[in-house]
Amino acid sequence: MAVDNKKRDSCSVTMKERFVRTTYAAVAEDRFGMRIAINIEGEEAMVKIAVDAMGGDNAPGEIVAGAVMAAQSREDIQIFLIGKEEVVSEELKKHTYKKEQIEVVNATEVIETEEPPVNAIRTKKDSSIVVGMNMVRRGEADAFCSAGSSGAILVGGQVIVGRIKGVERPPLAPLIPTEKGVSLLIDCGANVDARPSHLVQFAKMGSIYMEHVVGIKNPRVAIVNIGAEEEKGNALVKETFPLLKECKDINFIGSIEAREIPHGGADVIVSEAFVGNVILKLYEGVGATLISMVKQGMMTSLRSKIGALLVKPALKTTLKAFDASQYGGAPLLGLKGLVVKTHGNSKRIEVCNSILQCVTFKEQAINEKIKESL
């Protein structure tokens, strides 16, 4: 059964196509400790994405459907669907796709959200998360994408894939919608006990992301605070502010209050994970509530229904900005390989966009640029 064309069109495809199929002789590490594949044919490689088919509330159905959408939208990617082979293969039968683009990799275990992440990573060696991250570690995949356990992904990213030399803490960095487009919120859940030096690195990595992935030249960097004045804030913010001010690698504009974030007051919004996660969850909740309230309001009377028809095109565009599925997942920056965490309730469009997001990271050599900046 082919994927619905309307749904397929909703999956963003904006990256330049330039990777082709090849084979590798070996996997080595560059001078920064980054794992690289050695090409024996002299050609560029297809981008290979390992996808956790068993992670998330809607697995495996929506995960498999999203992977198929991504493969249908680009011919230069190869997707490894990792999970219980018989279950994933059965889902694949529902779709039309090129067999050479999607391969099922068997993994007999699943890490559940409620499991202690450290113990799960150590004991469930044949889980979809561990198998996928090991593929990245060995250079068999360029990126790993999962809607599964956040804790397991954070632990596995550091323990299995490993940090780039010089990176103190890898942050989670999702894009959030604003009046002016999008901003990067960094960190939103990985490091609740961050130090000033960590936040400075977050600012540098976030600037690289926004310049090379989103295309914003000299992105504005701000730190989340309770006021615009330099002397305001808790101890962490007060200690970090002068360090960011002195950093010549970023365009630091000072503090940003939460109310300024939706207006696009900065391109890179720096915070420790507790504050960042509260902002992200509030953002998602308010967005979902607004969409629901607007839809309900349009159906209260005949007059409102007629008015809704008149404003429908503009309203649809506006409300779409609050749809998290349009922005893909949150990369765990600063690792030796690409790891992207998608929402636990992700459906096919968000899965598709997260996979294509991995392609952009690879094409723009984000990890290499991060290494060079440290």
Question: Where are the model-predicted features located?
Answer:
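Short, Lys/Arg-enriched N-terminal segments with co-localized hydrophobic residues
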Residues: 29-45
